[in-house]
Regions:
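A short beta-loop-alpha structural element at the N-terminal edge
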Residues: 4-16
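A short helix-loop-beta-strand connector motif used in the catalytic cores of GNAT acetyltransferases and
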Residues: 44-55
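Conserved beta-strand in the GNAT
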Residues: 55, 61-69
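A short, internal acetyl-CoA/4′-phosphopantetheine-binding micro-motif in the GNAT/acyltransferase core
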Residues: 85-88
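A cytosolic small-molecule/anion-sensing beta-strand core signal
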Residues: 58, 83
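Conserved GNAT-fold acetyl-CoA-binding loop/helix
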Residues: 17-42
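A conserved beta-turn-beta hairpin within the catalytic core of GNAT-like acetyltransferases
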Residues: 71-82
Length: 88
């Protein structure tokens, strides 16, 4: 199976939200996902973006994602925080 990694684009947000819901179900907390597709689109398009997302694809099928965001540490400076890494 060939797997490719790419930056998520607006057209990927419905599939991303489905994967987020799958992850929440796996963690036995499906009711905790309050996020909407509209919120994902808005926050991804913010300047600067509220998060960054890479998706793993095999053909047209999205197999997983890595969602991250930048933060700042008074001890270390700029950091990248990986919020979730999920692969089916």
């Amino acid at each position: 199976m060939d797997v490719h990694i790419k930056k998520a684009i607006p057209a990927d947000m419905p599939a991303l939200l489905n994967l987020i819901r799958e992850l929440a179900s796996y963690e036995q907390a499906p009711e905790k996902v309050l996020l909407s597709e509209e919120t994902l689109l808005r926050d991804a398009a913010a300047d600067p973006p509220c998060f960054h997302c890479l998706i793993a694809l095999s053909g047209e099928e999205i197999l997983g994602f890595c969602l991250s965001w930048f933060r700042y540490s008074t001890w270390r400076g700029r950091l990248l925080y990986v919020e979730d890494l999920y692969v089916r």
